[in-house]
Amino acid sequence: MDEQNLLSRLRHGDEQALAAAITQYSAYVVTVIHNRSRGLLSPEDEDELASSVFFTLWQSCRTVKSGHLRAWLGSVARNKTVDRLRKSRCEVPLDED
Protein backbone atom coordinates (compact mmCIF):
# COMPACT_ATOMS: atom_id res chain seq x y z
CA MET A 1 0.00 0.00 0.00
CA ASP A 2 1.44 3.40 -0.91
CA GLU A 3 2.04 6.11 1.70
CA GLN A 4 -0.66 8.47 0.50
CA ASN A 5 -3.38 5.81 0.56
CA LEU A 6 -2.17 4.59 3.95
CA LEU A 7 -2.28 8.09 5.42
CA SER A 8 -5.71 8.74 3.98
CA ARG A 9 -7.06 5.55 5.54
CA LEU A 10 -5.38 6.33 8.87
CA ARG A 11 -6.96 9.77 8.91
CA HIS A 12 -10.36 8.11 8.50
CA GLY A 13 -9.74 5.88 11.52
CA ASP A 14 -9.07 2.67 9.61
CA GLU A 15 -7.46 0.24 12.08
CA GLN A 16 -6.42 -2.06 9.23
CA ALA A 17 -4.37 0.83 7.86
CA LEU A 18 -2.59 1.06 11.21
CA ALA A 19 -1.87 -2.68 11.07
CA ALA A 20 -0.54 -2.20 7.53
CA ALA A 21 1.68 0.68 8.68
CA ILE A 22 3.06 -1.45 11.50
CA THR A 23 3.78 -4.31 9.10
CA GLN A 24 5.34 -2.01 6.52
CA TYR A 25 7.44 0.22 8.80
CA SER A 26 8.13 -1.65 12.05
CA ALA A 27 11.55 -2.95 10.97
CA TYR A 28 12.56 0.58 9.95
CA VAL A 29 11.32 2.09 13.23
CA VAL A 30 13.09 -0.53 15.37
CA THR A 31 16.30 0.00 13.36
CA VAL A 32 16.14 3.76 13.94
CA ILE A 33 15.59 3.18 17.66
CA HIS A 34 18.42 0.65 17.90
CA ASN A 35 20.88 2.85 15.98
CA ARG A 36 19.99 5.94 17.99
CA SER A 37 20.29 4.13 21.32
CA ARG A 38 23.62 2.58 20.30
CA GLY A 39 22.60 -0.68 21.94
CA LEU A 40 21.89 0.89 25.35
CA LEU A 41 18.28 -0.28 25.32
CA SER A 42 17.10 -3.85 25.65
CA PRO A 43 15.18 -5.42 22.76
CA GLU A 44 12.06 -5.20 24.94
CA ASP A 45 12.59 -1.45 25.44
CA GLU A 46 13.12 -1.02 21.71
CA ASP A 47 9.87 -2.86 20.98
CA GLU A 48 8.04 -0.77 23.58
CA LEU A 49 9.32 2.43 21.98
CA ALA A 50 8.30 1.19 18.54
CA SER A 51 4.79 0.54 19.84
CA SER A 52 4.76 4.04 21.26
CA VAL A 53 5.76 5.46 17.86
CA PHE A 54 2.83 3.72 16.16
CA PHE A 55 0.45 4.81 18.93
CA THR A 56 1.59 8.39 18.30
CA LEU A 57 0.98 7.85 14.58
CA TRP A 58 -2.58 6.73 15.33
CA GLN A 59 -3.18 9.80 17.50
CA SER A 60 -1.42 12.33 15.28
CA CYS A 61 -1.85 11.02 11.73
CA ARG A 62 -3.54 14.27 10.69
CA THR A 63 -0.28 16.16 11.28
CA VAL A 64 1.76 13.93 8.94
CA LYS A 65 2.34 15.54 5.55
CA SER A 66 1.49 13.40 2.54
CA GLY A 67 4.57 11.70 1.18
CA HIS A 68 6.50 12.12 4.43
CA LEU A 69 5.26 9.22 6.56
CA ARG A 70 8.57 7.35 6.69
CA ALA A 71 10.47 10.51 7.60
CA TRP A 72 7.86 11.38 10.25
CA LEU A 73 8.11 7.90 11.78
CA GLY A 74 11.90 8.14 11.85
CA SER A 75 11.78 11.54 13.51
CA VAL A 76 9.31 10.40 16.17
CA ALA A 77 11.36 7.24 16.78
CA ARG A 78 14.57 9.26 17.24
CA ASN A 79 12.91 11.75 19.58
CA LYS A 80 11.28 9.06 21.72
CA THR A 81 14.60 7.21 21.94
CA VAL A 82 16.47 10.31 23.07
CA ASP A 83 13.75 11.02 25.64
CA ARG A 84 13.98 7.45 26.98
CA LEU A 85 17.77 7.64 27.22
CA ARG A 86 17.56 10.96 29.05
CA LYS A 87 15.02 9.55 31.45
CA SER A 88 17.08 6.44 32.17
CA ARG A 89 20.21 8.54 32.70
CA CYS A 90 18.42 10.67 35.29
CA GLU A 91 17.11 7.71 37.26
CA VAL A 92 19.38 6.97 40.19
CA PRO A 93 18.69 3.82 42.18
CA LEU A 94 18.17 4.42 45.88
CA ASP A 95 20.30 2.47 48.32
CA GLU A 96 18.31 0.33 50.70
CA ASP A 97 20.60 0.70 53.72
Regions found by a protein language model. Give the residues of each.
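N-terminal module of bacterial RNA polymerase sigma factors
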Residues: 1-27
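Hydrophobic side chains within well-formed alpha-helices
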Residues: 3-6, 17, 49, 69, ...
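Short, charged helix-capping/linker segments at alpha-helix termini
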Residues: 12-20, 30-52, 63
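Short acidic/histidine-centered micro-motifs embedded in hydrophobic/aromatic stretches
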Residues: 24, 52, 97
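Short, aromatic/basic-enriched loop-to-helix "N-cap" motif that marks the start
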Residues: 45-48, 61-75
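Conserved short alpha-helical segment within the catalytic ATP-binding HATPase_c
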Residues: 54, 58, 77-78
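Arg/Lys-rich amphipathic alpha helix in sigma70-family domain 2
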Residues: 63, 75-95
